Amino acid sequence: MFQISNLLIAADFSAEVANNSAVGMIGSFIAAALLIVVPATAFLIFVSQKDSLDRTSTGRR
């Protein structure tokens, strides 16, 4: 751990750069959730509900 902290100090990273990187990472997570996870979840719920309705309607025949 000591070597990593020395490397960061020696590389002269600023707090602003670290902050911008963290904000970008969080923004990427949010974008991924909005673009991939939410539509996939909605689609799977839709298919699951439709399949459930199909099974109950065929069971009544």
UniProtKB/Swiss-Prot annotation:
Chief localization: membrane
One Pfam family from the record: PsbX
InterPro entries in UniProt: PSII_PsbX (IPR009518), PSII_PsbX_type_2_subfam (IPR023428)
Localisation per UniProt entry: Cellular thylakoid membrane
GO terms classed as biological process: photosynthesis
GO cellular component terms given for this protein: photosystem II; plasma membrane-derived thylakoid membrane
Alphabetized UniProt keyword annotations: Membrane, Photosynthesis, Photosystem II, Thylakoid, Transmembrane, Transmembrane helix
Bilayer disposition of the protein: Single-pass membrane protein
Disulphide-bridged cysteine pairs: none
Domain of life: Bacteria
Membrane spanning residue stretches: 26-46
Entry function: Involved in the binding and/or turnover of quinones at the Q(B) site of Photosystem II.
Family to which this protein belongs: Belongs to the PsbX family. Type 2 subfamily.
Subunit and partners: PSII consists of a core antenna complex that captures photons, and an electron transfer chain that converts photonic excitation into a charge separation. PSII forms dimeric complexes.
HAMAP family assigned: PSII_PsbX_2
Full protein name: Photosystem II reaction center X protein
Biological source species: Prochlorococcus marinus (strain AS9601)
Source species taxonomy: Bacteria, Bacillati, Cyanobacteriota, Cyanophyceae, Synechococcales
